[in-house]
């Protein structure tokens, strides 16, 4: 996977465009997400561990919004249940191309990995097969808020009894002081990882119109409304969290 440093917002831009998962972002994405999302490596690796507890024989494991395939590869490494396969879906052609290259390289390094299919497509239009695990890793926040419940309802309908949805998202907070504190701490995290004030400000301008975070309470209420019976937060670092939702 590319190790090119993220310098996309290092120089002043006359007009900051909306953030998009284009070739420029794909090229630096591993560095960008590691330096921007506290706890990201822990979430990815443990998502595979958690999935292994819910995977059922001869079922599908979905990675929705798969980007470069980090979660897909964690699923393939940790799940050993007979007959499982992974379907990774992303709507960015650049991401899908690099994801396929990365996973093909992993196939040559590891034996007995789960089979995987990488699809370029819109997860809102996806026809789900019966699934035991669905991963939505920092994906829902980029979907229009009024389309989130319908997607989660369809995921719930596709889940086999005993399956699980694992949902990771950036959070907003209803309490203004709590929101301000965790926002400031997140900025401090990015500074500590080498981002300048200019980079932080321009990235914020680029992403604020395309990423709409929810509060933990909103996530819980929406998941219950979608038909899930149990919602358990299993990880949080600053304003980033991951939940397990059970049917």
From Swiss-Prot:
GO biological process per UniProt: tRNA wobble uridine modification
Keywords, comma-separated and alphabetical: S-adenosyl-L-methionine, Transferase
Keyword Flavoprotein: no
EC primary class: transferase
UniProt EC number: 2.1.3.-
Catalytic activity: prephenate + S-adenosyl-L-methionine = carboxy-S-adenosyl-L-methionine + 3-phenylpyruvate + H2O
Pfam families hit by this protein: Methyltransf_25
Database matches in InterPro entries: CmoA, Methyltransf_25, SAM-dependent_MTases_sf
Domain of life (superkingdom): Bacteria
Complex and partners: Homodimer.
Family, as annotated: Belongs to the class I-like SAM-binding methyltransferase superfamily. Cx-SAM synthase family.
Role description: Catalyzes the conversion of S-adenosyl-L-methionine (SAM) to carboxy-S-adenosyl-L-methionine (Cx-SAM).
Protein name (record): Carboxy-S-adenosyl-L-methionine synthase
Organism: Pseudomonas fluorescens (strain SBW25)
């Amino acid at each position: 996977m590319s190790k090119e440093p993220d310098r996309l917002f290092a120089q002043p831009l006359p007009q900051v465009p909306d953030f998009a998962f284009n070739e420029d972002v794909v090229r630096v994405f591993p560095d960008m997400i590691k330096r921007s999302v506290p706890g990201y490596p822990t979430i990815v690796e443990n998502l595979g561990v958690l999935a292994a507890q819910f995977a059922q024989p001869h079922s599908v494991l979905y990675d929705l919004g798969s980007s470069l395939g980090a979660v897909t590869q964690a699923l393939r490494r940790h799940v050993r249940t007979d007959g499982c396969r992974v379907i990774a879906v992303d709507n960015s052609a650049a991401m899908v191309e690099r994801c396929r290259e990365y996973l093909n390289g992993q196939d040559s390094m590891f034996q007995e990995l789960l089979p995987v299919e990488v699809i370029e497509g819109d997860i809102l239009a996806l026809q789900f097969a019966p699934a035991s695990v669905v991963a939505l890793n920092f994906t829902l926040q980029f979907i229009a808020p009024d389309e989130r419940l319908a997607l989660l309802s369809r995921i719930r309908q596709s889940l086999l009894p005993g399956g699980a949805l694992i949902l990771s998202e950036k959070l907003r907070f209803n309490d203004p002081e709590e929101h301000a504190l965790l926002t400031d701490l997140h900025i401090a995290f990015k500074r500590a990882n080498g981002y300048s004030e200019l980079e932080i400000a321009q990235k914020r301008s680029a992403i604020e119109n395309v990423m709409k975070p929810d509060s933990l309470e909103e996530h819980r209420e929406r998941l219950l409304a979608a038909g899930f019976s149990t919602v358990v937060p299993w990880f949080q670092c600053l304003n980033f969290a991951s939940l397990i939702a059970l049917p």
